[in-house]
Each structure stands twice: as C-alpha cells, then as structure tokens.
UniProtKB/Swiss-Prot annotation:
EC top class, as a word: transferase
Pathway as given in its UniProt record: Glycolipid biosynthesis; lipid IV(A) biosynthesis; lipid IV(A) from (3R)-3-hydroxytetradecanoyl-[acyl-carrier-protein] and UDP-N-acetyl-alpha-D-glucosamine: step 6/6
Organism: Stenotrophomonas maltophilia (strain K279a)
Gene: lpxK
Membership in a protein family: Belongs to the LpxK family.
Name by which UniProt lists this protein: Tetraacyldisaccharide 4'-kinase
Length: 339
C-alpha cells in the first residue's frame, strides 16, 4: 500500500536497466553538482561560518539512510557532555518551505517536516527549519545553542562546517553507483572519503556482521527496538507483549522492509503495510478491516498522533555506536570548544 509521498525508482537498487532518458540527464546533474562544489572550494562563492561548532550529519545518496536516529543519538550525547545543541534542518516536503519556523514537539509535520518534528519530540532541543541553513544556524546561536547539528545538508556548502558525518545503508550502499536521476548519488562515491566520520547503518546486527559490513575507517551503527508506545497515551508495552501475535506493521520510510524484519526478529507476526517515504497519512490509511494492533515507526507516528487510538503504537528506535566512535567525536569537538 502506498500513497502520497516519495518513491525510490526501482532501478537505483535492483539492478534493472536504467531508462535512457535518465542516463542522458545524469551527466548534466553531475556536471552542475561538481561546478557548484568547486565554486565554494575555490572561494568563487562565499561560505559562512558560525561562532560555534557545526556538525553535519548527511549522506551522498538521495533518500533515507538512518541520519535521523544518529542525529537524535548525537544530540543526546552532546547534551550529556554539557553542550547546548540545536538542530538545523530544511524540513523536506513541508508547507510554506520558504518560511523559517521553530519546530516544537506538537508542530504539525505538514508545517515542520517529518524529521524535524520527530527530533523535537524525542529530544526537546531547539529545532529550526529554514531553506537557508546559515540563517537557521544563526537563529539557533541567538537562542543560546553552543553547537549546531545539521540533519542532512552535506551538500549545503554555503554553511561552513567543522565535522562531517556520512551515513550509508549497509544493505543498499550506493545502489547502482550512478548519479541522480539514473541512480541515487547526489555526489560521487569519492566524496564519502572526505568526511570526518563514515557510519554504516546495519539495522539489527551482531559484532560479526558489523565487522564484515564495515571497511577501514567506517563505524557500525546498530538500530534497536524494545518497546511500543500507545499513540493515545498510557504506559508503553515491551515488544515481548506482541510475541506470537499478528500485527499490522506500518512503515512510510525509505527502507520499510527493515522495520518489518526487526519486528519479525522479535517473534511478531507481521502484516506489512509499506507506504511512501514522507507519506501524508489520513485516518483511512490505518483502516485495515480488523482491530489487530498497529505498530509503526516513530517517524510515521508523529503524523498519526491526531487520530491515533488505543491499538496504534509507536515503536521507538535507538541507535547504538561503538564507544570509540563517541570518544573520537567528542575529542574532535572538545578541541573546538571556546576557552
């Protein structure tokens, strides 16, 4: 099942032939991208620095790779270390995208964007959406933030950054290796090697899988689910409560199968409902003809809170990275802390 949202062309990842028109357009996109990047690198276009450290969490492919779970984990780590983080985002797909906005936990996703609302809901830190990330960063600094985390924005070169973190999906990687629109690449694969940290999103993985999936200089990120929170309020249930039961599983994310597999790994019988990424949900979208429990990702849940009921549950996702990753990152960041 799918609806209004964004769909990934199948030929990006499944090995099927790329339409000839897309092949012709890809070099044009690559050329414009390379020229734009060169303009910033050589100083032909101005870059703007903020008076506080800037960390960009992004990817070189179009679509989701696990940036938001990492951003949330990063914000929580920074706050625990005594920093006052703020998050800057474009707010993909939101209404009135030309108008900057402070995003709160209860901001409608149509106004604030899916990921910014989720980040505000999960962390409570200041979140600013603005097509101009320089302006967003300045607003966050004025609000008292002493470190800025950009959720996405690796290609937004106008904003100078101190640390770049690239996130790539372990299963999809860089797809067919072609530039948009023939493939998923926003920039050549070589761009990933220039980032300060490279994180591989493994989903559920053990240490052996992590070792096999990560090359030199790459850090494994595992995703964990443990509980389900009723959208109508009330106490969370452990996922073990649903073991042996059938549930409707809802995922409107870039890689919905991963969520379904995570639930199945917990012994839950899954009736899958894959929606488009950035799906604009309506109540009828969750009407499946039965009152089996409905388990959904938190990204979907923030768009369904207004009409959620007692059998609709959000499943929180927790990102886990090696302790050495956090040590390396905080060491780099501490060197940027003003004396």
């Amino acid at each position: 099942m799918a609806g209004k949202g964004t769909q990934t062309p199948p030929y990006w990842y499944d090995g099927s032939p790329v339409p000839w028109a897309m092949r012709l357009l890809a070099p044009l996109y690559a050329g414009v991208t390379a020229l734009r990047r060169r303009a910033y690198r050589r100083g032909w276009r101005k870059r703007y620095a903020l008076p506080v450290p800037v960390i960009v969490v992004g990817n070189i492919t179009a679509g989701g790779t696990g940036k938001t779970p990492l951003t949330i984990a990063l914000v929580e780590r920074l706050r625990a270390a005594g920093w006052k983080p703020g998050v800057a985002s474009r707010g993909y797909g939101r209404e009135d995208a030309d108008k900057p906005l402070w995003v709160q936990a209860d901001t409608p996703t149509a106004k604030g964007g899916d990921e910014p609302v989720l980040i505000a809901w999960k962390t409570g830190v200041p979140v600013r959406v603005d097509a101009d990330r320089v302006a967003a960063g300045r607003a966050l600094v004025q609000a008292g933030c002493d470190v800025i985390v950009c959720d996405d924005g690796l290609q937004h070169y106008r904003l100078a950054r101190d640390i770049e973190i690239e996130v790539v999906d372990a299963q999809r990687r860089y797809g067919n290796g072609r530039m948009i629109p023939a493939g998923p690449l926003r920039e050549p694969v070589s761009r990933a090697g220039e980032c300060d940290f490279r994180v591989v999103n493994l989903g559920q993985a053990d240490e052996e899988s992590a070792a096999q999936a990560c090359g030199f200089g790459q850090w494994p990120m595992a995703l964990h689910i443990d509980s389900a929170q009723p959208l109508a309020g009330g106490r969370a249930r452990p996922l073990s409560y649903f073991k042996g039961q059938r549930v409707h599983a809802v995922a409107g994310i870039a890689h919905p199968q991963r969520f379904f597999d995570m639930l199945r790994a917990r012994g839950i019988g899954v009736v899958p409902h894959a929606f488009a990424d950035h799906q604009a949900y309506q109540p009828q979208d969750l009407s499946f003809g039965s009152q089996l429990p409905v388990l959904m990702t938190e990204k979907d849940a923030v768009k369904c809170r207004a009409f959620g009921n007692d059998w609709h549950y959000a499943v929180p996702l927790r990102a886990e990275l090696p302790a050495a990753f956090w040590v390396a990152l905080t060491d780099r960041l501490d060197k940027l802390r003003p004396n």
